[in-house]
Regions:
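Core transmembrane alpha-helical segments of multi-pass membrane transporters/permeases
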Residues: 61, 82-110, 136-137, 141, ...
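Re-entrant/interfacial helical elements at transmembrane boundaries that shape
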Residues: 66-67, 113-114, 146-161, 176-177, ...
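Structural signature of hydrophobic alpha-helical transmembrane segments
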Residues: 33-43, 86-98, 148-149, 224-227, ...
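Flexible hinge motifs at transmembrane-helix junctions and intramembrane kinks/re-entrant loops
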Residues: 31-39, 46-64, 81, 259-263, ...
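Juxtamembrane and boundary regions of transmembrane helices in multi-pass small-molecule transporters
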Residues: 2-28, 145-148, 166-173, 177-181, ...
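Juxtamembrane helix-boundary/capping and inter-helix hinge elements in multi-pass membrane proteins
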Residues: 74-75, 105-108, 118-123, 159-172, ...
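Transmembrane alpha-helix interface/packing and boundary motifs in multi-pass membrane proteins
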Residues: 50-58, 134-144, 181-191, 275-281, ...
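Hydrophobic alpha-helical transmembrane segments of multi-pass integral membrane proteins
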Residues: 120-155, 351-394, 398-407
Length: 465
């Protein structure tokens, strides 16, 4: 066994402490007046969220362990334990992963990225803008954030080489951070574009029967945390990573004709986007649209994703992880853990129906702090079970409370909160220190400018009193 595998790091010590506390809760006698399943549920939830947050074992292993332990200790009925598997969020992810494979395999993603970057000038500032725009544009057609990162970071590095930005140059770091944040942060405003959005949609449906529509979600979030956040990323890159191009940018657009597979996938994506945008009219969930698009990609004769591609490249681990996170939310409610925690947390928050601005800031702060403690993907699993109590305390509609969680997990402070961002900076050779300075600056810009704008926009749309 390598020596490094035996070193007890802070995450491993934390996971060990979490496991010990979970076992104590599981074996402890039930306090008077409590239902026995409250402590069992608390132990299971602490184990799952603690191990998801520390990452000492792969997330899918934690997810499978969660399902196994939940079934063994009978913490809830089977339909609650496995509620995540029947959620539309899970199947939206499933279909999106298949489409993501097709976008990469056919080369359409690379063609789209190259053509978009070729529309801009040869200066550093222009290419930073191009990288952000490509990241946002791909968010509409490629649901996987990790897929967008893996596709675009190599393009950013190739552009850096053409512009004369060698290792260690600010320009190289700037292009990588433009891609890393441009593929994640504005995409939070697009419902099917990342995992936390899909988890939130799934928990809202599982817990409250609420269905988010693509168009309404886009209208609420995209003008501010989509468009204005992209602009903030642009200026943050130029502030922290100023540089000037030295090389000559080659034309990046593909000159070869589109292949048959690229054309077919283009038609599939256009139809999929149209159905997503018009879901308020036809009433079909984005999940079933995404799943149908994935099935079309797999059909014999179309073969945008071959059997071998599906078997070797489909990210089953992500599906298991999302199912587990959604089921955690269901158990928080069914076991009574949510009620017990809410009864103790809510009195500590400065919530009053007479102070909507304070309530708005407090709910966003709650989401942001949760993201720091448990990473951004955990926020839509941890907080939604408390949403009804928070709605009562603030006087906000339930959907408004749920939407504030989006602003919470989109306001990230450190790179570790978002796994795709960590992957991007590793692929791009950006140190955690440099990336951390960037995300802190972006968080400050968000708090000072974008969140107040969001408050005004939400009030204009009628989401806030």
């Amino acid at each position: 066994m390598p020596a490094s595998s035996r070193i007890m790091t802070l995450p491993r010590w934390t996971a060990l402490a979490v496991l010990a506390i979970a076992v104590i809760l599981l074996l402890a006698p039930t306090p008077e007046g409590w239902e026995p399943k409250v402590l069992r549920g608390a132990a299971l939830i602490l184990f799952a969220m603690g191990f998801f947050a520390t990452g000492v074992i792969p997330e899918f292993v934690t997810g499978l362990a969660f399902f196994a332990v939940a079934s063994l200790i009978a913490v809830a009925p089977a339909d609650v334990i496995f509620a995540g598997w029947s959620s539309t969020a899970l199947w939206l992810t499933f279909g999106g992963l298949i489409v993501g494979i097709a976008v990469t395999r056919t080369g359409l993603g690379g063609r789209l990225a190259a053509r978009l970057t070729g529309l801009f000038g040869e200066t550093y500032k222009a290419q930073v803008a191009a990288m952000i725009l490509v990241g946002v544009a791909l968010s509409f057609v490629m649901p996987s954030t990790m897929g967008r990162v893996i596709l675009l970071v190599p393009i950013a590095l190739a552009l850096a080489d053409r512009l004369g930005f060698a290792e260690g140059r600010n320009g190289r770091y700037g292009l990588v951070m433009a891609v890393a944040c441009g593929t994640w942060m504005p995409a939070v405003a697009i419902l099917p574009a990342n995992v936390p959005n899909m988890v939130l949609a799934g928990t809202a449906e599982t817990l409250y029967g609420l269905h988010f529509t693509y168009g309404a979600y886009l209208l609420l979030h995209f003008p501010i945390i989509g468009v204005f956040k992209a602009i903030a990323i642009y200026f943050a890159v130029l502030m922290l990573f100023p540089d000037r191009a030295e090389g000559s940018t080659a034309k990046t657009a593909h000159t070869t004709p589109m292949t048959r597979d690229e054309k077919v996938l283009s038609y599939v994506l256009v139809i999929t986007l149209a159905l997503w945008a018009l879901d308020f009219w036809h009433g079909i969930s984005p999940a079933w649209v995404a799943l149908s698009a994935g099935v079309v990609c797999l059909l014999p004769g179309i073969d945008l994703v071959s059997k071998d591609d599906f078997m070797t490249r489909f990210n089953t681990a992500s599906v298991i992880y999302i199912a587990a996170v959604l089921s955690v939310a269901a158990i928080i409610v069914d076991s009574g853990v949510g009620r017990e925690l809410a009864a103790r947390i809510l009195p500590l928050l400065p919530l009053d129906p007479a102070t909507p601005a304070t309530n708005f800031a407090t709910l966003i702060g709650l989401g942001s702090v949760t993201g720091i403690l448990a990473t951004a993907p955990s926020v839509p699993a941890v907080l939604p079970p408390f949403a009804q109590d928070l709605a009562t305390a603030t006087g906000f509609p339930l959907v408004t409370v749920l939407m504030t969680f989006v602003l919470g997990y989109s306001t990230m402070f450190l790179p570790y909160q978002v796994p795709p961002l960590v992957v991007a900076i590793q692929l791009g050779g950006v140190s955690l220190r440099k990336a951390g300075r960037f995300t802190l600056l972006l968080a400050a810009l968000t708090i000072l400018f974008l969140l107040p704008l969001s408050f005004l926009w939400w009030r204009f749309l009628g989401y806030l009193p």
